Design a protein with these regions (language model features):
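Catalytic core of non-heme Fe(II) oxygenases with the double-stranded beta-helix
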Residues: 65-178
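Non-heme Fe(II)/2-oxoglutarate
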Residues: 1-92
Length: 178
């Protein structure tokens, strides 16, 4: 059984709106250098510019950028994922709102890693990644599963955060990735 599952947003316009939100945040200097576990900036490990949705205050309401529609679909994906693993009546709490990560061509999360513990100190059971644009030769590679998720606009992948799902970014030398 594969413990990663892929889903697709029904409205791909959500992706465009979230990219617009990121760009607006970047213009207001609300983005920051991507961090790795422990909150360290280590560009030799991960090179990106990141933005937490919860910091969107100066940009208007997140719903202005279809974040509410994204959150609704994401919650449905998570429910479906948990049911597929026959994990019922479990309460999982999202500790923080999602972040948008931007990678220039050649940038990415270069090293194998797991996401069980975040830089904010929260313990994670599951990870989700939603690709906001198509990235040929981009995506996420899973070490033990010998499996690569393609970065397709609107695709969400959910997987366990622990050691069983060590992964890294597939670096595109030609394309940006959100």
């Amino acid at each position: 059984m594969r413990f990663s599952k892929e889903y697709t947003l029904s409205d791909l316009g959500i992706c465009d709106s979230l990219i617009d939100l990121y760009k607006a945040a970047d213009k207001k200097d609300l983005t920051y250098a991507g961090r790795v576990g422990g909150g360290s900036v280590m560009p030799e490990v991960k090179k990106s510019r990141d933005f937490f949705i919860e910091d969107a205050g100066p940009l208007g309401e997140p719903s202005d950028y279809k974040f509410d529609l994204y959150q609704e679909q994401l919650n449905g994906f998570i429910d479906s994922y948990l049911q597929s693993l026959t994990i019922h009546n479990q309460e999982f709490v999202m500790q923080r709102l999602p972040q948008i990560q931007y990678y220039k061509p050649g940038d990415g999360f270069y090293t194998w890693h797991v996401d069980a513990s975040g830089s904010d100190g929260c313990d994670r059971a599951f990870v989700y990644i939603t690709y906001l644009n198509d990235v040929p030769n981009g995506g996420t590679e899973f070490f033990y599963q010998e499996y690569t998720v393609e970065a397709k606009k609107g695709k969400t992948v959910i997987f366990p955060a622990g050691l069983t799902h060590k992964h890294r970014g597939v670096i595109s030398e030609e394309h940006e990735k959100y």
